UniProtKB/Swiss-Prot annotation:
Belongs to the universal ribosomal protein uS14 family. It holds the Pfam family Ribosomal_S14. The lineage of its organism: Eukaryota, Viridiplantae, Streptophyta, Embryophyta, Tracheophyta. This is Small ribosomal subunit protein uS14c. It is found in: Plastid, Chloroplast.
Length: 103
């Protein structure tokens, strides 16, 4: 089980990312726009605005965690579980449609 503080930190990052998502997206779109090209000084101002946003609001700072244990590694996106929790749940027939492989 991951520390509670790490799980809370990750939740805080998710909230920040959702809060600043549209702002970050619009600034990036304006910087990359080829339809109405900006001058160099305008682009630097846009980049400064982008850099002034909180670091934890960047989507690259997010990390998937197992929603049961909070483990940050070996996560399966389809289930939202880490590998060993997924394996245990499949063995106990708690996941519908998932079966053990045998050959």
């Amino acid at each position: 089980m991951a520390k509670k503080s790490l799980i809370q930190r990750e939740k805080k990052r998710q909230k920040l990312e959702q809060k600043y998502h549209l702002i970050r997206q619009s600034l990036k779109k304006k910087i990359r726009s080829k339809v109405s090209p900006l001058s160099l000084s305008e682009k630097t101002k846009m980049r400064e605005k982008l850099q002034s946003l909180p670091r934890n609001s960047a989507p690259t700072r997010l990390h998937r965690r197992c929603f049961l244990t909070g483990r940050p590694r070996a996560n399966y996106r389809d289930f939202g579980l880490s590998g060993h929790v997924l394996r245990e749940m499949v063995y106990e027939c708690l996941l519908p449609g998932a079966t053990r492989s045998s050959w």
